[in-house]
């Protein structure tokens, strides 16, 4: 896997829209994956023998314009979710700095552990709304996919989900790479 042509952060500013605007969603079965209410990590694990999280980078950064409701820095974590050594999903998480000290979460010590397992195993993280976006073939994420030897021939689709913890809100974006879409839609 070669991701040296780009560097952290890989994400980009994009227009997200409410998932209930079904006229803009891709056809099934990818649509069902985008709108799945539970843990994407858990769903992905049912499709492989070996599940792995590859951390691309993490650190304190300013979010992209219109990416996060509050101004100022957040903790950004970008990973690839790989199934049987094939990257299926690019994930970008925005964590408010106030949550970094949350003892039960240990966001800074996650390493290669899946964030989804943490979020869906604790009652104090409440899943919120899902938004959906598409990324064209010239996007940074399409270039990332190409550097992973995955040709992007049409739009990449992704979702972002809000998680609430008290007064704090974190955002998890998950973009399906071409290998995932091929496997899901075959």
UniProtKB/Swiss-Prot annotation:
Compartment(s): Cytoplasm
GO molecular function, one term: chorismate lyase activity
UniProt pathway: Cofactor biosynthesis; ubiquinone biosynthesis
Family: Belongs to the UbiC family.
Protein name: Probable chorismate pyruvate-lyase
Top-level class of the enzyme under EC nomenclature: lyase
Function: Removes the pyruvyl group from chorismate, with concomitant aromatization of the ring, to provide 4-hydroxybenzoate (4HB) for the ubiquinone pathway.
Any Pfam family the entry gives: Chor_lyase
Residues noted as binding substrate in the record, renumbered to the chain: 77, 115, 174
Superkingdom, natural source: Bacteria
Keywords recorded for this protein, A-Z: Cytoplasm, Lyase, Pyruvate, Ubiquinone biosynthesis
EC number(s) per entry: 4.1.3.40
Keyword Amino-acid biosynthesis recorded: no
Main location (coarse class): cytoplasm
InterPro entries for this protein: Chorismate--pyruvate_lyase, Chorismate_lyase_/UTRA_dom_sf
Catalytic activities: chorismate = 4-hydroxybenzoate + pyruvate
Any one GO cellular component localisation term in the record: cytosol
One of the GO biological process terms: ubiquinone biosynthetic process
HAMAP family: UbiC
């Amino acid at each position: 896997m070669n991701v040296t042509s780009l560097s952290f952060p890989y994400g980009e500013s994009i227009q997200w829209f409410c998932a209930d605007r079904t006229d803009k969603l891709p056809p099934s079965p990818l649509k069902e994956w985008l709108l799945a209410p539970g843990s994407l990590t858990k769903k992905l694990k049912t499709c492989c023998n070996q599940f792995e999280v590859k951390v691309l980078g993490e650190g304190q950064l300013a979010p992209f314009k219109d990416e996060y409701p509050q101004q100022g820095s957040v903790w950004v974590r970008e990973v690839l979710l790989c199934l049987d050594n094939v990257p299926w999903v690019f994930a970008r998480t925005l964590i408010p700095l106030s949550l970094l000290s949350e003892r039960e979460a240990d966001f800074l010590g996650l390493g290669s552990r899946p964030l989804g397992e943490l979020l869906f195993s604790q009652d104090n993280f409440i899943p919120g709304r899902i938004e959906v976006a598409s990324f064209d073939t010239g996007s940074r994420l399409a270039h990332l996919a190409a550097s992973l030897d995955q040709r992007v021939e049409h739009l990449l689709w992704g979702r972002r989900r809000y998680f609430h913890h008290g007064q704090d809100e974190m955002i998890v974006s998950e973009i399906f790479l071409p290998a995932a879409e091929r496997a899901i839609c075959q």
